[in-house]
Amino acid sequence: APSLRLRF
């Protein structure tokens, strides 16, 4: 699963 930290 992609990390949300990459977007935020």
Swiss-Prot record:
Location(s) in or outside the cell: Secreted
Record flagged with keyword Transmembrane: no
GO biological process: neuropeptide signaling pathway
Gene Ontology MF, one: hormone activity
Superkingdom of origin: Eukaryota
Gene Ontology CC annotation, any one: extracellular region
Modified residues (Phenylalanine amide): 8
Membrane-crossing segments per the record: none
Keywords: Amidation, Hormone, Neuropeptide, Secreted
Functional note: Neuropeptide. May be involved in the regulation of adult diapause.
Similarity section: Belongs to the NPY family.
Protein name per the record: Neuropeptide NPF-2
